[in-house]
């Protein structure tokens, strides 16, 4: 016979088992949510790859793609070994405001979903810079700044702003004032950081050859990318990724209200991007009479960047102002870069630094408890409206201080590194390599080798003729000299100079012969012309 005591014990055991299963279930659900969002954010690397590949000339496509590949590889190793420890490792009392110093190589740490989610954020911050230095950056420079950002710059910033011990997160508490750094999904810590470094890198590296030929001209010669479809596809992938970037920053899905916050963040993100795109498109059409696709994509991304800071607590109507501000700031910063004669092929500074800075400010202006709400309370004569106004402006001021700290830290660390690379001749490729393209010289792999294309019965015969025109050339100087066997391949730009719009082969005018870099290419062009006349 079961006694009351035994029955109570069994009930307690059953309750404990149910609690254990419930806790485990919630942990698994949250882990799955974080990993799922992180996978989508990781796919943003593909978006950056397409966006940047389409925006560069065909002769540099392989170069930009391998940089995007290695971004993921370098960042995971650096963040695993050092970055996580500096960002979220336990801190001693003396340095806890500025940096963590434990859990290197994830020693003693097992919250892998959280680590994976933060890693993809780190990779995003690092990959932003590659667009600003495209088509002229030495490979060692890319590896260097990618490593420094993922292992040092970004982790320290996240410790400042996203840990309870960080000085930005602690803020200032004095009387009625209680400020804390407000950046839900990284407008400042990810995008303002990456955008600021993009500005520095593009400035120190200098413009691409031919970008600003006339020092007296405030405009620039447009250097066209080779694939609008690639750029558009990359933009769509990034738009998709931003929904997970911001929605996933809730970091859980099992608590009451989590699903609502995730949905709100995603809705605000796409709304901000939409308003930014439309305001920019309208202004651009008014100024130039053209409905631009490429720049509208950038404006949309700028709006999504701006939404990162306050998307979890803004009302959807507020996205009108977030998006409009982001679109106009992108327009202003893009024109400023041209006026300063700083060549940023992907507008990385305008998109990420401009959008990121506005995001930090707007989260303290039009989010709940922001300046706009405090002013409305003051006008309506609400109780304690004066205190609310003081708190709102104090929070806005703290956001400004934190934004300047992010810029100062990012530039302060990278400036001496870029300076050393420039002084040692490792910052930028030679003029010869830049003019002829990085793909062949640096990687030995053309993105679009003409020998890979075939559409007729005479391809084999023509391939044999082309092979006969192969030549050896010497590239580089001193210890960097290389003797390379060059087949008469041409970039897409050079091929376009041979064909007219109807697809017929036309004679080469004298002034365009400079497009061909060796005698083999000239021979091939002449051969194609001679065959066409038969």
Curated annotation (Swiss-Prot):
Annotated TM spans: 31-51, 69-89, 115-135, 139-159, 184-204, 223-243, 263-283, 291-311, 318-338, 346-366, 401-421
Entry-linked InterPro entries: Ammonium/urea_transptr, Ammonium_transpt, Ammonium_transpt_CS, NH4_transpt_AmtB-like_dom
Primary localization class, coarse: membrane
Entry GO terms, CC: plasma membrane
PROSITE patterns, A to Z: AMMONIUM_TRANSP
Membrane topology of the entry: Multi-pass membrane protein
Source organism, top-level taxon: Eukaryota
Protein name: Putative ammonium transporter 1
Family indicated by similarity: Belongs to the ammonia transporter channel (TC 1.A.11.2) family.
GO MF term set: ammonium channel activity
NCBIfam families membership: amt
Protein task: Involved in the uptake of ammonia.
Keyword field: Ammonia transport, Membrane, Transmembrane, Transmembrane helix, Transport
Organism: Caenorhabditis elegans
PANTHER family for the chain: AMMONIUM TRANSPORTER, AMMONIUM TRANSPORTER 1-RELATED
């Amino acid at each position: 016979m079961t006694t009351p005591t035994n029955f109570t014990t069994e009930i307690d055991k059953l309750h404990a088992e149910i609690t254990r299963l419930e806790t485990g279930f919630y942990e698994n659900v949250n882990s799955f949510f974080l990993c799922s969002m992180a996978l989508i954010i990781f796919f943003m690397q593909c978006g950056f790859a397409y966006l940047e590949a389409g925006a560069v000339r065909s002769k540099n496509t392989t170069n930009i793609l391998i940089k995007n590949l290695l971004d993921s590889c370098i960042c995971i190793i650096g963040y695993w070994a050092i970055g996580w420890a500096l960002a979220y490792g336990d801190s001693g009392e003396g340095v806890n405001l500025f940096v963590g110093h434990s859990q290197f190589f994830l020693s003693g740490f097992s919250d892998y979903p959280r680590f994976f989610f933060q890693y993809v954020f780190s990779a995003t911050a690092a990959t932003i810079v590659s667009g600003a230095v495209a088509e002229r950056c030495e490979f060692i420079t890319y590896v260097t700044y990618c490593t420094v950002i993922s292992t040092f710059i970004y982790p320290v910033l996240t410790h400042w702003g996203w840990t309870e011990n960080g000085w930005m997160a602690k803020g200032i508490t004095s009387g009625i004032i209680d400020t804390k750094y407000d950046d839900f999904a990284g407008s400042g810590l990810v995008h303002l950081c990456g955008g600021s470094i993009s500005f520095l890198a593009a400035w120190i590296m200098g413009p691409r050859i031919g970008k600003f030929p006339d020092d007296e001209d405030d405009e620039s010669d447009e250097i066209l990318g080779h694939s609008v479809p690639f750029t558009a596809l990359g933009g769509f992938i990034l738009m998709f990724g931003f929904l997970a970037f911001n929605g996933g920053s809730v970091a859980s899905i099992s608590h009451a209200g989590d699903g609502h916050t995730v949905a709100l963040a995603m809705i605000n993100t796409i709304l901000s991007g939409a308003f930014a795109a439309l305001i920019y498109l309208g202004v651009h059409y008014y100024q130039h009479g053209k409905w631009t696709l490429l720049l509208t994509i950038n404006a949309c991304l700028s709006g999504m960047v701006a939404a990162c800071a306050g998307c979890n607590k803004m009302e959807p109507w507020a996205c009108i102002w977030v998006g409009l501000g982001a679109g106009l700031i992108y327009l202003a910063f893009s024109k400023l870069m041209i006026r300063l004669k700083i060549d940023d092929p992907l507008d990385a500074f305008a998109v990420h630094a401009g959008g990121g800075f506005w995001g930090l400010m707007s989260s303290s202006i039009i989010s709940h408890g922001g300046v706009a709400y405090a002013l409305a309370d003051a006008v309506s004569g609400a109780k304690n409206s004066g205190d609310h106004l003081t708190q709102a402006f104090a929070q806005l001021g703290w956001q400004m201080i934190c934004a300047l700290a992010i810029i100062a830290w990012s530039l302060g660390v990278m400036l001496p590194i870029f300076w050393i690379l420039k002084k040692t001749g490792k910052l930028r490729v030679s003029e010869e390599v830049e003019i002829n393209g990085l793909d062949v010289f640096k990687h030995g792999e053309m993105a679009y080798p003409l020998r890979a294309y075939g559409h007729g019965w005479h391809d084999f015969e023509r391939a044999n003729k082309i092979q006969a025109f192969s030549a050896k050339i010497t590239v580089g100087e001193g210890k960097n000299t290389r003797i390379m066997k060059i087949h008469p391949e041409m970039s897409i730009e050079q091929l376009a100079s041979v064909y007219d719009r109807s697809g017929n082969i036309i004679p080469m005018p004298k002034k365009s012969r400079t497009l061909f870099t060796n005698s083999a290419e000239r021979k091939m062009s002449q051969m194609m012309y001679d065959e066409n006349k038969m």
